[in-house]
Amino acid sequence: MEASTQSGQSAGVWGGLSRQIAETIESVADSIVTVHGGGRSTSSGVVWRPGVIVTVRQGLRRSDSLQVAYGGGDPVQATLVGADAGTDLAVLRVETGATKPVETIGAQAARVGEVVLAVGRSALGDISGSSGIVARLGSGWRTWRGGQIDSLIRPDVQLYVGQAGSALVNEGRRVLGINSTALARNAVITIPAATVDRVVDAILERGHVPRPYLGAAMQAVPVPEASRAQFGEGVDEALLVLHVEANAPAATAGILVGDLVLSVDGKLVHNVHGVQRQLSTLKVGDPVAVAVIRGGVKMELKVILADRG
């Protein structure tokens, strides 16, 4: 009798959980679309605002032949407003449909261990879902392409074919963010709603996310041993300026071909990635000190960072 009671209770728990998962997926299904990104490429997309769909940049192959499909309906044309490699996000606009945006929630409401669902659509438009937990939460970070992510959300979910760009949904039927497989090796990262909002705002306003640049092509070269002591401890490599783009911030500041760049904003740089990493901490319009060696003399130039556009 006791075993029968326990079995019945277990069935009740699993039945309740199963219904809750199915109902949660159904509750957001009208806001999830299939994105046909050109060729055979498909991904999922999320209705973020009326007429505005957010998907992942990695799923777009051609910007001139984009379509989105709602459920089993016929695909409709979509226009690429802009895409951001730094965060792997792309913003599409449609003239029909996309009338039911998702309800979002901030990453601060998430808890490690809570059950979450990745909700997307297949290439045929069928709703798809996978479940897991929030495996890790963390503070803001920068992607390998220089994008600023407001907080780390790493779910333990498997994304099936077409689920890149899917929504990560919590038990309250709110969307924590957009799922991407392009920001970390062999891992799903959820781009939090705050980051998505910021990128969408920038793209709708400017067509891109503004990021500062110098406008100089450089290559790492060793600093002669005889000069290392003269230019400071740790200066064993510098960046040789090979080309300066006309009217770029570097040109305006007086950086010349042949200069050796030692540091940017007070930080030694040993390779181009070091420069990009340092620039990613700054904003368009910021003044930045660039230390160079010219003709054996160390000097510091003030560069006003601009938007590459």
Language-model features and meaning:
Residues 15, 19, 107-110, 128, ...:
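Soluble non-cytosolic domains of exported or imported proteins
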Residues 37, 121, 139, 180, ...:
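Short, conserved catalytic or interaction motifs in soluble domains
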Residues 1-12, 23, 40, 49, ...:
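C-terminal recognition in membrane/secretory proteostasis and scaffolding
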Residues 86, 139-143, 175, 220-227, ...:
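Active-site/binding-pocket entry motifs
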Residues 9, 32, 38-128, 153, ...:
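Conserved active-site neighborhood of the chymotrypsin/trypsin-like protease fold
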Residues 51, 113-119, 168-173, 250, ...:
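A structural signal for short beta-strand/turn segments enriched in small hydrophobics and glycine
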Residues 29-31, 90, 95-103, 128-186, ...:
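Active-site region of chymotrypsin-like
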Residues 25, 43-46, 166-168:
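His/acidic/aromatic-lined binding-pocket segments of jelly-roll/cupin-type domains
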